[in-house]
Amino acid sequence: KNCLIDGGSSDVSSVGAYRIEPYLLYCGIRNIDYAFVSHGDEDHISGIRELLEDQRLGIGIRTLVLPAEEYWDEKLKELAVLAAENGTRIAEIHAGEQVVDGTGEQKMSLRCIGPEMGLSESGNAASMVLQAEYGNFSMLLTGDVEGAGEKQLVKSGRLGKCRILKAAHHGSPHPILPSRCLSS
């Protein structure tokens, strides 16, 4: 299955049309089975929005995966409406749920480890956090989680070891969970 996790830009216009779509077509990918969106900031959704608007001609998105609806801001609500209008299935993923493809050594899973229900903050703090696993490879994808969401993640006990950390805020100078990263 083909998965896209976030896709946008706050400083490159038409990132979907001029960067994401050409790259996917170059790789021979014409359909995205699951497009995950961690939260509603433009730098995470603008390219996915473009793909949804143009999928009859370009890249098709079969399922748009969003965090729990209680964390949707206006941009995520608009994205869900756009997806539905263009025939894309909408799915929510909650902490503890996962998408799995394949079996045995070929098994790939994307497990949602945050946010837990009832987080008092929204926006970046409520970013969807995913643990990707394929064989012995693991990667933590943090969206832009911060503050209460980051603290909740540590307390949840869901954080596992990972080989690669996709740092929150695109590698900001204020890294997620520095003590946790050192212990992994």
Region roles according to the model:
Residues 1-184:
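Non-globular, low-confidence helical/coil segments that flank catalytic cores
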